[in-house]
Amino acid sequence: MKIGLMGGTFDPPHIGHLLIAEQAKEQLQLDAVWFLPAKLPPHKQSTVTSAAKRLELVRAAVRDNQDFSVSEIEFERETKSYTFDTIRELKRRYPEHAFFFLIGADSLVSLGTWHRSEKLYKEIEFGAVARPGSRYLIPEGARVTAVDMPLLEVSSTDIRQRVARGRSIRYLVPEPVRQLIEEWNLYAT
């Protein structure tokens, strides 16, 4: 099987994440997309929402799509989650699968700074999704396939700010995610 991997903090997951996954699934001819929420993201000092709640938000976001699922592999570690380590472990557990790591094209610029990046390039191919204002600057040695998608300016930061200001996030996040945000009183100040 060809599996797309979508890592992230997902604080919260939104329609942009789902659109990226769907477009990558179609264009890269993937059989499934696995969402990999980071328990302890290495690039952030802290998250707004607990890891357990972010995991539940991702589950709620993908539950209506049979081709999407959530992996808890990064929750098995008590230390920061590095993509290289996660990919190696997934390949060990599922040697019959071919994996693609889905990434925003704007993140390609910093890919060389990722933990063990040169070895990561040998481990996995990347599906790079264009974001508004980004260009494909592919690091030497990285295997990258472009994924086109409609440009959609939505971010987790904007969603958190909207909630804090009492503004609607309807249609920016899946309805089950919106309901959990409201129920748990997330992001309100």
Curated annotation (Swiss-Prot):
Question: Catalyzes what?
Answer: nicotinate beta-D-ribonucleotide + ATP + H(+) = deamido-NAD(+) + diphosphate
Q: What pathway, per the record?
A: Cofactor biosynthesis; NAD(+) biosynthesis; deamido-NAD(+) from nicotinate D-ribonucleotide: step 1/1
What the record says about family reads: Belongs to the NadD family.
What is this protein's function? Catalyzes the reversible adenylation of nicotinate mononucleotide (NaMN) to nicotinic acid adenine dinucleotide (NaAD).
UniProt gene name: nadD
Q: What is its EC number?
A: 2.7.7.18
Keyword Membrane in record: no
Family matches, as Gene3D superfamilies: HUPs
Print the keywords alphabetically.
Answer: ATP-binding, NAD, Nucleotide-binding, Nucleotidyltransferase, Pyridine nucleotide biosynthesis, Transferase
Enzyme class label? transferase
- InterPro entries of this UniProt entry? Cyt_trans-like, NadD/NMNAT, Rossmann-like_a/b/a_fold
Native species of this protein? Exiguobacterium sibiricum (strain DSM 17290 / CCUG 55495 / CIP 109462 / JCM 13490 / 255-15)
What protein name does the entry list? Probable nicotinate-nucleotide adenylyltransferase
Q: Does the keyword Protein biosynthesis apply?
A: no
The residues that cross the membrane are: none
Any GO MF annotation of the entry: ATP binding
**GO annotations under biological process?**
NAD biosynthetic process
HAMAP family, A to Z: NaMN_adenylyltr
